[in-house]
């Protein structure tokens, strides 16, 4: 019985290859051996961020530095970064335990010849869960060269390709140059997984044990995540959950939907992937595998993310964010962070270079104000610590810049004011440890949540910034201890998401029953026939089962297609009805809008006319006070009635002249002398013309 990394117990005994000859020497003749990866150009594989020291201390015993070990709470180890001699001089010193890639601390493995898969890799001794097995070494190339080599190797007739995606646009090619890790075969139920570490400024890819691996057992991992080949190939892993094919552009049913480290960081369980894949199958939709990314965006978008509840959850999230350049995954991980309300987890976020990560996220999402707002809000709720991490990350300067944006001004001011009250301290050094080791070994103290060891007045002091407590002796508050309800010393241990072995029941309902592949022990018990006859019957049975499976799949596909066509037709009809209704609704809206605009225009014209008429009436009244007196002497010439009519005409003409000059101006309270003279002249000219016309008319009658 073996237990996988995700805690699932596999009752199927692993197959051992103890008596198969060692073929390592022969296998190495098929490629050029490399001790380290080569990079063309040299900047490929570079980490995008500067190296960060851990906060461990040297721990020499028996001539060996035990710092940063498997059971330590080393920040670098938890975030998949190796410590480097010369760069950790103020912390863990030289040759600590977190240098497995650099020291080539490989597991004892060898190459052997498999029955159907060519060469394979087996364990020469037991390997414990999450132990480092081997670095995947090869030529690191750009995407354009990767595509050229894919075509080239296919034309050369190569059956096996050895491409692994290191990061976006960069690939490790171990086809012609590499190491024996290239011979690790695929399995649908693997005992190892691939993870990426930052080692001395370069991103490295390593193979790690997913569960206990017994001596003689083949070492396998899932190709369907980071490994690339030209065409899909038959799978010969013989696992109960085998899907039949691996590689190619289209993912198979059990293909991983995103890299192991991303899945662990997002809190994705195997059942979640399986449920989504089954749902896609039911819809008759293929799960496409992109050439440019290892993340299935549709699957990730379908997830309902959960907050971090354990230290290892935080470790996984922060280790990915330290390396990631994928904004899509970064946004999803940020969502998981902001959902977390547990203060113990908040302290762990801060501890694992939290302020540095949030500083990078602000830069990554500088053109997305909604995400920036989320980051600032989360920073505001983080508990108080020392100011060292804030200053080192430079996040205070970025918040200062964001303050110039009106939307962020208030929250940035609140955040900067909060940080201004934090204190900066010199952390305890190795010299301080040496001087105080006679009294107490500071390296072995497991501090409660929120506590730090700082240097004050030449002596180590225990400090809790949130509670504003300093004391000379180690804190003993059990309610805040890291090893009580929350294990803050946990190290990120990626878990396997491979499907578990199926039970001996039919995989499908109906008349056709699928018989699972027998276990290795069952096959041993049935070998009463000769090997030749046994193999013949086995081949025949497999062929029959394959045909039955293909027939069943074909029937399922036809049923699903018919159902999908019917649903598509219903959907199209519904969309047509909705479209017609929307068109009618839009037409009514436009007509109503047009009517409103016409009504508004009429009101506007009427209002303007009303305003002009009011002003005109004021001018008429104004001139009516003066014109009759100016022309009263003409009554003897034209008569009383004609004089009144003439006065009205003169007043109206004068009012029209004023409106033409300015239709909004009202008349003055009094008529000025200059204006009176002009009005008098106009009025008398009008009357003189009228008198002349009347005299001319009388003379014609005579």
UniProtKB/Swiss-Prot annotation:
Keywords: Chromosome, Coiled coil, Methyltransferase, Nucleus, Repressor, S-adenosyl-L-methionine, Transcription, Transcription regulation, Transferase. Disulfide bonds: none annotated. It catalyses: L-lysyl(36)-[histone H3] + 3 S-adenosyl-L-methionine = N(6),N(6),N(6)-trimethyl-L-lysyl(36)-[histone H3] + 3 S-adenosyl-L-homocysteine + 3 H(+). Residues 529-541, 656-674 have a biased composition (Basic and acidic residues). CDD domains: SET_SETD2 (cd19172). PANTHER family: SET DOMAIN PROTEINS (PTHR22884). Histone methyltransferase that trimethylates histone H3 'Lys-36' forming H3K36me3. Involved in transcription elongation as well as in transcription repression. This is Histone-lysine N-methyltransferase, H3 lysine-36 specific.
């Amino acid at each position: 019985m073996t237990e996988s990394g995700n805690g699932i117990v596999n009752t199927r005994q692993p197959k051992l290859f103890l008596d198969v000859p060692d073929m390592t020497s022969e296998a190495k003749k098929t490629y050029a051996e490399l001790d380290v990866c080569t990079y063309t150009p040299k900047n490929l594989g570079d980490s995008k961020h500067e190296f960060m020291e851990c906060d461990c201390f040297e721990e020499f015993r028996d001539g060996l530095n035990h710092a940063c070990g498997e059971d330590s709470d080393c920040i670098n180890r938890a975030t998949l970064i190796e410590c480097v001699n010369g760069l950790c001089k103020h912390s863990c010193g030289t040759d600590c335990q977190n240098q497995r890639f650099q020291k080539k601390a490989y597991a004892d493995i060898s190459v052997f010849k498999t029955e159907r898969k060519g060469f394979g890799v087996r364990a020469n001794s037991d390997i414990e869960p999450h132990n480092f097995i081997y670095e995947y070494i090869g030529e690191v190339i750009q995407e354009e060269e990767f595509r050229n080599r894919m075509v080239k190797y296919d034309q050369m007739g190569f059956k096996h390709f050895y491409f692994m995606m290191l990061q976006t646009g960069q690939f490790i090619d171990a086809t012609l140059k590499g190491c024996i890790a290239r011979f690790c075969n695929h399995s649908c139920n693997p005992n190892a997984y691939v993870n990426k570490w930052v080692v001395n400024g370069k991103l490295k890819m390593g193979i790690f044990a997913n569960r206990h691996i017994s001596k003689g057992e083949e070492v396998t991992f899932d190709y369907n995540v980071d490994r690339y080949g030209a065409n899909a190939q038959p799978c010969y892993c013989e696992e109960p959950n085998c899907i039949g094919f691996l590689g190619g552009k289209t993912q198979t049913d059990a293909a991983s939907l995103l890299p192991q480290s991303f899945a662990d960081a997002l809190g994705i369980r195997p059942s979640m992937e399986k449920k989504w894949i089954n749902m896609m199958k039911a819809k008759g939709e293929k799960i496409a595998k992109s050439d440019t990314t290892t993340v299935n965006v549709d699957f990730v978008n379908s997830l309902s993310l959960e907050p971090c509840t354990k230290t290892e959850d935080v470790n996984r999230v922060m280790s990915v964010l330290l390396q990631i350049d994928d904004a899509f995954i970064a946004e999803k991980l940020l969502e998981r962070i902001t959902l977390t309300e547990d203060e113990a987890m908040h302290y762990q976020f801060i501890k694992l270079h939290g302020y540095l990560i949030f500083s990078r996220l602000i830069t990554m999402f500088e053109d997305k104000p909604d995400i920036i707002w989320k980051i600032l809000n989360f920073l505001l709720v983080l508990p108080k610590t020392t100011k060292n991490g804030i200053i080192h990350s430079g996040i205070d300067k970025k918040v200062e810049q964001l303050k110039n944006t009106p939307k962020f001004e208030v929250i940035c001011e609140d955040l900067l004011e909060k940080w201004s009250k934090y204190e900066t301290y010199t952390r305890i050094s190795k010299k301080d440890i040496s001087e105080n080791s006679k009294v107490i070994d500071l390296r072995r103290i497991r501090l409660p949540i929120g506590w730090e060891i700082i240097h004050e007045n030449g002596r180590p002091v225990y400090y809790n910034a949130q509670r504003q407590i300093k004391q000379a002796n180690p804190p003993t508050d059990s309610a805040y201890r890291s090893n009580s309800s929350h294990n803050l010393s946990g190290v990120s241990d990626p878990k396997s998401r491979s499907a578990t072995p199926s039970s001996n029941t039919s995989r499908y309902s109906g008349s056709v029953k699928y018989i699972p592949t027998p276990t290795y022990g069952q096959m041993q018990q049935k070998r009463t026939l000769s090997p030749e006859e046994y193999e013949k019957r086995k081949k025949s049975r497999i062929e029959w089962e394959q045909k039955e499976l293909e027939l069943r799949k074909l029937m399922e596909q036809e049923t699903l297609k018919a159902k999908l066509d019917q649903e598509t037709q219903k959907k199209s009809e519904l969309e047509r009805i909705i479209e017609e209704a929307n068109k009618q609704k839009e037409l009514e809206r436009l007509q109503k809008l047009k009517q409103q605009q016409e009504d508004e225009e009429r009101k506007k014209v009427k209002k303007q006319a009303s305003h002009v008429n009011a002003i005109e009436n004021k001018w008429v009244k104004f001139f009516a006070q003066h014109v009759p007196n100016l022309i009263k002497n003409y009554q003897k010439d034209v008569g009383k009635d004609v004089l009144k009519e003439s006065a009205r005409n003169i007043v109206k003409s004068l009012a029209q002249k004023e409106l033409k000059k300015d239709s909004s101006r009202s008349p003055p309270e009094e008529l000025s002398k200059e204006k009176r003279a002009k009005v008098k002249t106009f009025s008398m000219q009008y009357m003189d013309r009228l008198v002349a016309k009347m005299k001319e008319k009388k003379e014609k009658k005579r």
